[in-house]
Amino acid sequence: MKGRRASRRMIAVAVAVTIVLYFGLGALLHYKVFPEEKPPEWAHAKPGFAFETPTGERVEIIRGTLETDGQFAEVHFDIAPGGYVAAAHIHPHLEERFEVISGSLTALVGDEEKVISAGETLVVPPGTPHQPFNRGEVEMRSIARITPPGNGDIFFGQLSGLDYKPSFLQQMMLFVQAYDAYPASPAPAVVGTLSYLLAATARLVGYRGFYPEYAERFLRGAAQQSDAADPRTSR
């Protein structure tokens, strides 16, 4: 009996050590030895580029990351009647400010539902769960400012390439690792830890934080909508 218990203990210790080594070595390789390359400048959407999501959002770039030297991004952010942002989410390091131009914006901010009318502004501080809706009968039009911008003008192109339905591992790579976008639940600390540990595994099986082919396809479509230049054209 004692021998069996000792054997089980040794197996449990061996498994635990293997898991720790796997995640530790994976993190070392992913973050330090072979880090993912940053998205190239051409992947940022240019001013005038416009796109729509399946849930009724329409975004048009006014000033992106490159135009403001990474200080902020400014976009026309509109939602069709009955439209919504797909899921409640958190940006731990970004502030979002929505100045409503026409219609009304309904937003779940933390545990509170707010209605912002034309002429009013909604400020979402960093780390605050939020989800905008349009429950009105007319289009909600606003100007949104994101500070700092991160890679928000790249994010939608990546999401579009995934048909707006990323898998769990892809979310760990795309949302959290690359674009500072966390689901509202569980807590960001939990999601951040999971993302840190699973990113190497996700990358090992083929997931990435940036897909050039998605960016090119998306920006060509946005250029056609806005009569803008080819995505690889220099600024």
Q: Which residue ranges define each predicted feature?
A:
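Structured binding elements
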Residues: 98
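Short, well-ordered beta-strand segments enriched in hydrophobic/aromatic residues
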Residues: 73-79
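Jelly-roll (double-stranded beta-helix
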Residues: 2-72, 83-88, 94, 106-235
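A cytosolic small-molecule/anion-sensing beta-strand core signal
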Residues: 101-102
